[in-house]
Design a protein with these regions (language model features):
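ATP-dependent carboxylate-amine ligase catalytic core
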Residues: 1-74, 90-92, 118-119
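Nucleotide phosphate-binding/pyrophosphate-handling subdomain across enzymes
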Residues: 56-61, 67-80, 84-87, 163-287
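Beta-strand->loop->alpha-helix junctions that form or flank phosphate-binding loops
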Residues: 113-117, 127-154, 170-174, 199-208, ...
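Acidic-glycine-rich active-site phosphate/pyrophosphate-binding loop
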Residues: 152-165
Length: 353
């Protein structure tokens, strides 16, 4: 990770560029220049990659697709499209096909993906660019990875087989087996382009990869967040914020916490499919505490409670403070506490240490 000093240095450089651009715009009477937070973060990443002389850079899109900040980079060796769900609908479209069409616009050369609905694969195979206001279609070289086979797992990770070989990952959820399989397939395509990646590096990378706030079983809550986890209790962080992500969380609850009492501490942004998320998760909870995420786009806890309470089989309450809500849930009568619904929840935990 970058040091605080490096982040400050790169942010300062980006700010100076933004200010210079605004001066020019003011001189010519052009509209105000307002880059988004993600655009600024992408610029910071580009400076870091250049400054650190990285050989290979992996860029993850924001909302993904044609208008994504990362699409400013033309020199792409490989593009990867993970399972597509209904998210960012206001910007990308209301169907899987429409969303896939926008996401596919960012791809270049070889595209690695997994088994997806036919309408999605069709769009990935036939992306288009917009030039002079017209659509120009092109053919993409699409590689679909093979299906993984789950072998065994616990709260520390999973073992699966892919193409006849066993691999281990530390992340939870059957969907991560698909993501890992895409990564293995992508490495195979990079090798065809003469990238030297040996099997040991691949296996080590898969095993050591962690993704905070994605079905994360929290081990060091006291040190990081000043939260105490009682003995025999489990704390999980999950930032999934659409029905697709809620389904993966629901499946994990059924797989990993069968016959356990579950307390959800839930906060969701109002521009998400709140009812869809709640319909999937609420019936699995013995208790739910509604909170308001730290965002101007947040759904207020009172409104969320009105939606989720009829779906919950147990008590549904509200709490003002996120950390207090989590600690109270851990101290209660449920075995598993899951803080979920939005990635914004976890930044609040860190800032309120």
């Amino acid at each position: 990770p970058l040091s605080n000093e490096d982040v400050a240095k790169y942010l300062t450089a980006v700010r100076e560029c933004i200010e210079s651009e605004q001066i020019l715009r003011n001189a010519f009477g052009i509209s105000e220049f307002k880059p988004t937070a993600f655009e600024i973060e992408t610029a910071v990443a580009m400076l870091a990659f250049f400054d650190k002389e990285c050989d290979v850079c992996v860029l993850e899109t924001g909302l993904g697709g044609r208008w994504d900040a990362t699409n400013a980079i033309d020199d792409k060796v490989l593009s990867i499209i993970t399972p597509i769900g209904l998210d960012h609908c206001a910007l990308l479209g209301n169907t899987l096909g429409e969303i896939a069409s926008e996401k596919a616009a960012i791809t270049k050369d070889v595209v690695v993906t997994c088994a997806q609905p036919g309408e999605v694969i069709e769009q990935i195979k036939n992306p288009y660019d917009i030039k002079d206001g017209k659509k120009e279609y092109r053919k993409a070289n699409v590689v679909v990875c093979k299906e993984p086979k789950f072998l065994r797992g616990n709260l520390d990770g999973q073992v699966f087989s892919y193409d006849g070989k066993e691999y281990e990952i530390s992340m939870l959820g059957k969907h991560q087996l698909v993501n890992a399989s895409i990564a293995i397939c992508a490495v195979g395509e990079l090798r065809k382009k003469h990238f030297s990646i040996d099997d040991n590096a691949l296996e080590k990378g898969l095993k050591n990869t962690v993704w905070k706030a994605r079905l994360q079983v929290v081990k060091n809550a006291k040190e990081e967040f000043n939260i105490t986890i009682p003995q025999d209790k489990v704390l999980v962080f999950d930032g999934s914020h659409n029905p697709q992500g809620a389904t993966t969380l629901a499946n994990a609850i059924k797989d990993l916490f069968k016959n356990k009492r579950v307390h959800l501490v839930l906060g969701i942004l109002k521009d998400k499919d709140v009812k869809g998320i709640c319909t999937i998760l609420a019936p699995l909870a013995n208790r739910i505490t509604c909170i308001t995420p730290p965002s101007p786009r947040a759904m207020q806890k009172e409104e969320l409670k009105c939606i989720v309470a009829p779906l919950c089989k147990g008590e549904c309450s509200m709490q003002d403070d996120i950390k207090t809500a989590v600690q109270n849930a851990l101290n209660g009568d449920c075995d598993v506490t899951i803080l979920c619904g939005s990635l914004t929840l976890f930044s609040e935990l860190k800032t309120n240490e």
